[in-house]
Design a protein with these regions (language model features):
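Beta->alpha loop/short-helix hinge microenvironment recognizer with preference
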Residues: 1-415
Length: 415
């Protein structure tokens, strides 16, 4: 590896560099990266921000995102054996807060789900919580694990009630966490991709399309509230306030929390790819695509964007300060090592008993598997450009690489 002092000298040489900031530095078509590059340091100096503080993971992910595709992220050096020109290829950050890296991360996540998913009817289920509970999860991000646990407990309970007629069946399901609504406000909820039916102990798939809504709603509410009680039990004052809120919620939400689990048309059942893409869409990138930004004025420090209100299906245009916009985005950055996508039941990686049955059913149902696409092949496929091909037509040879000291513990990130 190149030493730090040598790296500074190397970056002064005239080389061909794949530096993303040159591509995204356009106010008419601003990227999230550009907006944070221009205003994040000033955002950190705001009195309200200083008072509340910033989570360490936010500072780390933003720093990684800002350095993505630049020499600050590290690089590899290549030399053309024919013309002897030097080429530098900058590393990407692989941050969950990076729009461009997130696209690839989401694509890989979708491919992983497609690889394990059976070609059987699935249902999209959305588990929501009472608005009054949202602040608890905002104060303590680790409580978000409760939403996964509660959704899993609810689904397992619903399918256990089917044992009388169908014997024992195990569904396959994938849970993903979304912490936002379309207006970018804090709204944690669970999206679930659930098989309509399950695998028996003999390895057969039995279909059942009926789902008891009442059990789903009331069961999920009970699981969430009980699990939150356990999590808050060590704080007597907080626990007392929460118990009072729980009593009020049971009175107000007699039918349980809202759970959305519509039937999918038969023609859509045959291809769940679009559903998978939607469920994992924002699990590895910022919660808003840059394409929704309609105007950005760096001098006035204003930004305009739009979203579609799901209740009215009408477009809503928003204009606000860049600082307010930044604040909305960073609160959705998950903690380090927090898994936004989790696998359960027949799809659980630790379910060794059903693994062989799932593999057999997948081959029997002609389920197509997907392979991870590497950086080089991805550029060739999408842009028709080979990053290792010199302009003279010869392939370059690898010389050396450089990773900044601060990122060397995360060397796996630069795959």
């Amino acid at each position: 590896m190149i030493k730090d002092n040598w790296a500074k000298a190397i970056t002064k040489f005239p080389t061909k560099s794949f530096d993303k900031m040159h591509i995204n530095n356009n106010p008419k078509h601003p990227s999230i990266q550009l907006i944070f590059h221009n205003h994040f340091n000033d955002f950190l100096e705001l009195p309200d921000v200083k008072k509340v503080g910033i989570r360490p993971v936010v500072l780390k992910e933003v720093e990684k995102m800002l350095s993505c595709g630049t020499l600050d992220a590290g690089f590899e050096i290549y030399e053309c054996p024919h013309c002897h020109n030097m080429h530098i290829i900058c590393y990407t950050c692989k941050s969950r807060f990076c729009s461009s890296c997130g696209v690839n991360r989401t694509r890989e996540q979708s491919a992983k789900i497609r690889k394990i998913a059976l070609q059987v009817p699935h249902r999209h289920v959305v588990f929501t919580i009472d608005k009054r509970l949202r602040l608890y999860f905002r104060k303590d991000y680790h409580l978000l694990n409760i939403l996964f646990l509660s959704a899993s407990q609810t689904i397992d309970y619903v399918f256990s009630k089917m044992k009388g007629k169908l014997n024992s069946i195990t569904p396959g399901y994938v849970l993903t966490l979304h912490t936002f609504g379309r207006d970018l406000k804090w709204n944690p909820h669970i999206h679930c991709l659930l098989t309509e039916g399950g695998i028996t102990d003999l390895g057969n798939f039995i279909r059942t399309s009926y789902i008891n809504y009442s059990t789903l709603r009331k069961g999920f509410m009970k699981c969430v509230l009980n699990n939150m009680k356990l999590a808050l039990a060590d704080n007597p004052m907080e626990f007392k306030k929460f118990k009072e809120l729980v009593n009020q919620i049971y009175k107000d939400d007699e039918n349980g929390f809202y759970v959305f689990a519509p039937d999918i048309e038969e023609k859509k059942q045959k291809d769940i790819d679009s559903l998978i893409d939607y469920v994992v869409r924002y699990t590895g990138r910022p919660v808003m695509a840059a394409s929704r930004i309609t105007n950005y004025n760096p001098n006035k420090k204003e930004i305009s964007y739009y979203y579609e209100d799901h209740t009215t299906s009408q477009r809503v245009d928003v204009t606000e300060s860049v600082y307010e916009f930044i604040g909305k985005l960073i609160k959705h950055i998950p903690e380090e090592q927090f898994k936004m996508v989790r696998y359960y039941g027949a799809y659980a990686t630790c379910n060794h008993k059903l693994k062989k049955f799932v593999r057999f059913l997948r081959s029997k149902l002609n389920r197509i598997t997907f392979q991870k696409i590497g950086y080089r092949r991805q550029l060739i496929t999408i842009f028709g450009t080979d990053p290792l091909l010199c302009s003279c037509g010869h392939f370059m040879n690898y010389i050396d690489n450089y990773i900044p000291q601060k990122w060397r513990n995360d060397i796996y990130e630069f795959a």
